[in-house]
């Protein structure tokens, strides 16, 4: 009995992330979500869950992930999957236990795009052949169409390939459409406010901050986000004025910390940096041993996340040792905003 209990405690204990990530003094990291049995190369047997490139939290501290699948594969390649919901505390997933973490209905090429009011998960989907995309809001596992979808006959689709989504303090919803080279602005009910809020080549990622600014990362000439680019990050201020604040390799993910700082994951340079208001880069983390960041997001600060012990922590989807087919989620804790203010 004692041996079984000890084995269970060891199984549930967080794993150290080893030396594949280099962090500033005062920060710690652990593996938060991992898995076994998903690597198709039985000889390699890499740990991790099926590849995922989008991540978001609700106000309770539950983590949502979506499979990357063959979203950029072209041709007839597409995927129909539910998203994952990981309860506070993390998880170790296997093919036998995967079902308990699946959340909501199967959707076509889903991406966890963001959250709203701490309760609703915004999910984008698209059908490559029909060139029709949709934005869903998901609550309690039920998906409800918010905008887009199949239009009336003779009417062009609002979205063709929606990717990121974000909500500002006034409740407006912003959606990137990578195929149509625009960012669309919606009201809280999904009605179109501005179909061309921003015109930019292959926009993919979105974030908003408490200053009323909208941040958009685009892929530029890269046909797929795993290509080098170059890409760029545009900041739109509350007056609607846009400015390019960063040019470089295509970034994998962006996310705003609870203190309002924009963190950027650069897969090609294998690092995470902070982008200041004037476009200055502040180094935060670097990866070794052929590891790289694939996505990132911060847990919100709420009474529930504080009780769960994850409030304000940074979570990173990691590609380990160049193995794209499976990924792990790392949790990083530390004084993020104090570090940036000190730089």
What are these regions, as identified by a protein language model?
Residues 74-75, 79-85, 133-136, 181-185, ...:
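A short loop-to-beta-strand structural motif that recurs across blades of beta-propeller domains
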Residues 86-91, 138-142, 186-191, 236-241, ...:
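Short loop/turn segments that connect beta-strands within beta-propeller blades
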Residues 38-60, 102-120, 152-170, 200-213, ...:
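Beta-rich, blade/repeat-based domains predominating
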Residues 293-343:
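Blade-level signature of beta-propeller repeat domains, shared across WD40, Kelch, NHL, RCC1
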Residues 17-30:
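Blade/loop signatures of beta-propeller domains
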Residues 68-70, 125-128, 178-179, 219-221, ...:
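Short loop/turn segments immediately following the C-termini of beta-strands
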Residues 64-66, 121-124, 174-176, 215-217, ...:
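Residue position within the beta-strands of beta-propeller blades
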Residues 30-46, 92-103, 143-156, 191-197, ...:
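A short beta-strand motif characteristic of beta-propeller blades
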């Amino acid at each position: 009995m004692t041996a079984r209990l000890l084995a269970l405690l060891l199984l549930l204990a967080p794993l150290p992330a080893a030396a594949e990530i280099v962090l500033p003094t005062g920060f710690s990291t652990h593996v938060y979500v991992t898995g076994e049995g998903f690597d198709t190369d039985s000889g390699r047997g890499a740990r991790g869950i099926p590849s995922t490139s989008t991540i978001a939290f609700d106000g309770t501290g539950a983590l949502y992930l979506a499979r990357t699948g063959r979203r950029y594969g072209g041709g007839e390649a597409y995927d129909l999957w539910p998203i994952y919901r990981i309860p506070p505390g993390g998880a170790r997933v296997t093919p036998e236990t995967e079902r308990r973490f699946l959340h909501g209905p199967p959707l076509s090429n889903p991406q966890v795009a963001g959250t709203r009011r701490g309760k609703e998960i915004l999910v984008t989907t698209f059908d490559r052949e029909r060139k029709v995309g949709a934005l869903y809001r998901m609550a309690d596992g039920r998906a409800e169409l918010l905008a887009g979808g199949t239009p009336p006959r003779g009417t062009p689709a609002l979205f063709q390939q929606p990717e990121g989504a974000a909500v500002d303090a006034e409740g407006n919803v912003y959606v990137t459409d990578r195929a149509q080279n625009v960012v669309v602005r919606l009201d809280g009910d999904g009605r179109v406010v501005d179909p061309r809020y921003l015109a930019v080549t292959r926009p993919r990622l979105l974030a908003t901050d408490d200053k009323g600014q909208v941040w958009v990362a685009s892929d530029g000439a890269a046909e797929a986000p795993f290509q080098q680019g170059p890409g760029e990050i545009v900041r739109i201020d509350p007056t609607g004025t846009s400015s390019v604040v960063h040019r470089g390799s295509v970034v994998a993910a962006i996310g705003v910390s609870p203190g309002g700082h924009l963190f950027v994951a650069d897969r090609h340079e294998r690092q995470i940096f902070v982008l200041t208001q004037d476009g200055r880069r502040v180094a935060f983390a670097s990866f070794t041993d052929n590891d790289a960041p694939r996505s990132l997001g911060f847990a919100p600060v709420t009474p529930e996340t504080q009780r769960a012990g994850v409030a304000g922590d940074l979570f990173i989807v990691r590609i380990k040792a160049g193995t794209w087919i499976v990924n792990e989620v790392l949790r990083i804790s530390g004084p993020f905003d104090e570090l940036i203010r000190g730089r």
